[in-house]
Swiss-Prot record:
Protein name, UniProt field: Kappa-actitoxin-Avd4h
UniProt keyword list: Cleavage on pair of basic residues, Disulfide bond, Hypotensive agent, Ion channel impairing toxin, Nematocyst, Neurotoxin, Potassium channel impairing toxin, Secreted, Signal, Toxin, Voltage-gated potassium channel impairing toxin
Compartments it resides in: Secreted; Nematocyst
GO molecular function terms listed in the Swiss-Prot or TrEMBL record: ion channel inhibitor activity; potassium channel regulator activity; toxin activity
Classification lineage: Eukaryota, Metazoa, Cnidaria, Anthozoa, Hexacorallia
Native source organism of the sequence: Anemonia viridis (Snakelocks anemone)
Function statement: Blocks Kv3 voltage-gated potassium channels. Reduces blood pressure.
Tissue-level expression: Experimental results show no expression in the ectodermal tissue from the distal and proximal tentacles, body wall, and oral disk. Since paralogs are expressed in this tissue, an expression of this toxin in this tissue is probable. The negative results could be explained by the very low abundance of EST sequences.
InterPro entries in the cross-refs: BDS_K_chnl_tox, Myo_ane_neurotoxin_sf
A UniProt-annotated Pfam family: Defensin_4
Disulfide cysteine pairs (residue numbers): C38-C73, C40-C66, C56-C74
Keyword Disulfide bond attributed: yes
Primary subcellular site in the record, as a coarse category: secreted
Maturation propeptide residues: 20-31
Superkingdom: Eukaryota
Length: 77
């Protein structure tokens, strides 16, 4: 019983370490977390696709958008 409990504790600690490492890599991702590249008709640049959102999130400097139901493509500046 003690060996099984110790093994569960080791697995839990390893999961926490690997999860924290993955979060550090996410900070250096090529695009914003939660957004994927998208294109709208009539726009030359690439936008950020936000899945299952009705509006563009605040704090990213988005100034225009287009809808691809149920998603939204948001454009900065």
């Amino acid at each position: 019983m003690n060996k099984a409990l110790f093994l569960c504790l080791v697995v839990l600690c390893a999961a926490v370490v690997f999860a924290a490492e993955d979060l550090q890599k996410a900070k250096h991702a090529p695009f914003k977390r939660g957004a994927a590249p998208c294109f709208c008709p009539g726009k030359a640049d690439r936008g950020d696709l936000w899945i299952l959102r009705g509006t563009c999130p605040g704090g990213y400097g988005y100034t225009s958008n287009c809808y691809n139901w149920p998603n939204i493509c948001c454009y900065p500046h």
